[in-house]
From Swiss-Prot:
It comes from Chaetosphaeridium globosum (Charophycean green alga). Belongs to the PsaA/PsaB family. InterPro entries: PSI_PsaA, PSI_PsaA/B, PSI_PsaA/B_CS, PSI_PsaA/B_sf. It is found in: Plastid, Chloroplast thylakoid membrane. This is Photosystem I P700 chlorophyll a apoprotein A1. The gene is psaA.
Amino acid sequence: MTIRSPETEVKIVVEKDPVKTSFEKWAQPGHFSRTLAKGPSTTTWIWNLHADAHDFDSHTSDLEEISRKVFSAHFGQIAVILIWLSGMYFHGARFSNYEAWLSDPTHIKPSAQVVWPIVGQEILNGDVGGGFQGVQITSGFFQIWRASGITSELQLYSTAIGGLVLATLTLIGGWYHYHKAAPTLAWFQDVESMLNHHLAGLIGLGSLSWAGHQIHVSLPINQLLDAGVDPKEIPLPHEFILNRELLAQLYPSFSKGLTPFFTLNWSEYSDFLTFRGGLNPVTGGLWLSDTAHHHLAIAVLFIIAGHQYRTNWGIGHSLREILEAHKGPFTGEGHKGLYEILTTSWHAQLALNLALFGSLTIIVAHHMYAMPPYPYLATDYGTQLSLFTHHMWIGGFLVTGAAAHAAIFLVRDYDPTTQYNNLLDRVLRHRDAIISHLNWVCIFLGFHSFGLYIHNDTMSALGRPQDMFSDTAIQLQPVFAQWIQNTHTLAPTLTAPNAASSTSITWGGNLVAVGGKVALLPIPLGTADFLVHHIHAFTIHVTVLILLKGVLFARSSRLIPDKANLGFRFPCDGPGRGGTCQVSAWDHVFLGLFWMYNSISVVIFHFSWKMQSDVWGTVTSNGVSNITGGNFAQSANTINGWLRDFLWAQASQVIQSYGSALSAYGLIFLGAHFVWAFSLMFLFSGRGYWQELIESIVWAHNKLKVAPAIQPRALSIIQGRAVGVAHYLLGGIATTWAFFLARIISVG
């Protein structure tokens, strides 16, 4: 790293009182748009109001003003999250059996919702144990609270109030930084300073403070809880923080204070900063001393990372230099020009972040079962299934959003004259090769993965089981996956000799059971997994094909060379040009959402059945008795098996839930099917049909002299599609949710 002359001094500049605080203005619907502010003449107005309220690009073209609005909106977003969290903690304090659950987490089920006795719906308050009647929850909050050392409802109340105080502060912050002291554009574009502060401050100090909490509060409290001490007898958090002797009784190295730290004898601290691997056999969760160690290590790494970028001192990296130096022999100008894109297009920035965090959320979904981070999480099957499903859906939506904002960037913010022969330009120029190859891959994967199932269904139907692909006939073992599992099982002996076991028991090793229930065991992979994994590959590639085609052809195509002029969303390329409908970038996102839904559905079905068949169950003297008795390997290799032994067999709980505490899931299952079916009305019918119908209804109103002042209009083609896809996804997700929960709460 060379020492250079400092960059131009960064001055923190804010503009004082840039926008007047005016309740009169806010009270006027559509105040952000000249057209909308005039008020409604047709019913289209309300749709445009919702479409454009947060599309800050449509309010102004001034990047500084857009940046301030986004920045201010983030404060509001954080406030909403804090209010929601506060509500969760309040429910835990006011309406839950948390203290009872804490004293016996293996037999008592978590509940933090009590239904009021109106029209007989108190039937939903099932007996969850510990003399408590309520709705069983599957959010994992109880497990998080125990891991963080919360032992009483008073602590939950206090945290709930703290959340509301923080929410108030963020709301004031959002108002203050837009109306009183708004940052200038230069501040939003100062990426080096932003990286330093976010890496060292948010992630580094955030992880450090959490590690401190874990070490001084969570670890001692959980150590005592694991030993069976009554929560009411355990000292309060501030006693552990203020009285070192208390901690030293549990972790002797505390008596030595900071001496080992400054004398570099760090191994002295290994009684509370461990590197064990595997799960705590008492709770079935990761060792909390491992996770404290992890957060401390993350803090150190990110605090160092937050000192890497060059600001007012002449040392460190410049992001522009890094990007412009990034070129190889075959990549033309490399990343030259990307710095300008990422500092002037927040859509480009957002697309990258959504792609990254979407992928990360999907990785989190897998870690939540493979390395369950909280005590008693692994044996709470309803929560495990809910957390996996939730993070998979969220990840799918974020990745689809990445494609949406990448396309918006190309339509609204991309300037081809400044991007010549860099990697982005080169990708756009050979987009035909990319898309046609990807299309071929999708066809190959589709025919081959589906073909294996069709073969099996045919052989099964003809009574020829010996000719099927299965673990007992023609084997297609996932040998690469099995090799990876084996390698990871053996890894600790070589790479981490002090670790007691590998990172996850799913790789291999010994079963962990808590209270007679399986927490985790090595997950066997066979022919049925090989087949469904290729369906995963197929659905994911098709989703990517649709979304990537939308991005790469967002500005132009052979069919519509001037697509950029038509905008991000448009129904067709004007009258007189047939065959040009559904080509806008928005339409690709619309279509991509359906395939995203396909992809995630297959994944969560696979997970749900696989875990019930091969992992979850009870441990007896004869071994493990799984919920569905290992039927995945025999049945999941035919389409008929998926329909009969998964969907139909496991739907019995939700279909037969009427008259029980689970009956709400039966109603949701039914209602969500209706919502899903309702979406088809929007997706399968044309706009003209509705306009004709509306006009005859308006005629009838005129006859009766009750005609509305605001003229009714059919939804535009794009509005109709948006309503359709929203109900399709909402209906589908809620149906799956009811199906999963009724099933797993009954049998888990």
